[in-house]
Amino acid sequence: MIKILQFGEGNFLRAFAEHYIQAANEKGIYDGKVAICQPRKNNAVINALKKQNNEYNIILKGRLNGKIIDEVQHINCIEKCIDTVLETEELESTFCSHSLELIISNTTEAGICYNGNDKAENFPNILFPAKITYLLKKRFDSGKSGLVFLPVELIENNGNELKNCILKYAKLWNLGDEFINFVENECSFCNTLVDRIVTGKVEYESDACAVSCEPYASFIIEADEKARKVIPFTKVDMGAQFAASVLPFRKRKVKILNGVHTMSVLAGYNAGFKIVRDMVNDETFKAYILKGLNEEILETIDLDKEQLTSFAQSVIERFNNPFIDHKLLDISLNSVAKFKARCLCSYLDYYNKFGKAPKVLSFAFAGLINFY
């Protein structure tokens, strides 16, 4: 029975969302299949999955809770793949099915946007939020219940942004107050924050759709009571949790994961390192990273200390992934903008709290100046 429709067939969702769905089904806490469609015209992955009976493998490689993980997870939770362009009737039928309850999407950061020139009659050749508006109107007209939307696009307030776009299209297309009320009161739009390094497509036996990723995963979901009853992922011990707001977790991710990257990369490159793993395996440089992380960055974040410490430890563990050669020069791109967004906030917060400059973050800034 199809309970989930997913807009997005790329490596990230197949290594992230399907992993959660598969785990929930295997543990007996969920009984639902997913249908996948591509949000754009390119149907190469959809066709490749169809040739494999909609099955593929996730290759999990990395460190988790102190252990080296090198595992394969077979995925068979996909009921069908739908070509958005060539199989519009199938897409509409699935969207209007009685069993459907959850929509997952990843249409890139540019996917959730509004275009006043989009017209309903041009479906499916319209933007993703316009497609959803068109399909939701079909579902509303068929008398079906509202849906829960779980966008994982990496923009702030992704659920709210999707909802706002849909409401704009509803007004643009004169879909009526009853439909607008349906969207606002019968549907739930969740803000989310996701985190997993997906290294991409890999060769695995005869599987043309195999994808590789780290074992670590985090899925923070800002959901109302209706959505919490529908979403099964928090029942699986894989880093998914409901939260009153994703904003503190976004701040945590930016300051710790992204911030430590930026704090260490240029100083590390200046010290002669080439990849991230070598930095954290050098005792002297690791001490530098831990001092900046524990004594400066963590001191500026107002969250549960136990959770902060656990997350910080997982970040260092992820940096030491023996299967990923993460090049410092690749991470160094746009470092000035990255330092401003990821490290300057911690620098200023520390200064305002303690009345003095943080030594490690100051050294990181010196490394930035020296690099350029």
Annotate each language-model stretch with its function.
Residues 1-372:
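Substrate/ligand-engaging "lid" and interaction regions
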